[in-house]
């Protein structure tokens, strides 16, 4: 199962917030931000920090993409 963080990027655009601002304000590393940009797995701690900063739920910033092979 894949994850997509497209919802997060759309929220940042709506809030007129740069990725670097999110990184600093949420206290996440640049490597975590890079993983998000590649739709790779990140820890729940990273997701919690982002949700806390943006005041959104985890379902508002990411979605699961079902495997097509099933």
Please provide the spans of the model-predicted regions.
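Short, basic-rich loop-to-helix N-cap that marks the start of a DNA-contacting helix
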Residues: 40-52
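A short, Lys/Arg-rich alpha-helix, primarily the initiator
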Residues: 1-20
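The alpha-helix within a helix-turn-helix
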Residues: 12, 23, 37, 51
């Amino acid at each position: 199962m894949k994850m997509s963080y497209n919802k997060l990027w759309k929220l940042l655009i709506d809030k007129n917030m740069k990725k670097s601002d999110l990184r600093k304000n949420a206290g996440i590393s640049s490597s975590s931000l890079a993983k998000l940009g590649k739709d790779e797995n990140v820890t729940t701690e990273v997701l919690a920090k982002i949700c806390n900063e943006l005041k959104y739920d985890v379902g508002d910033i990411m979605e699961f993409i079902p495997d097509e092979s099933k």
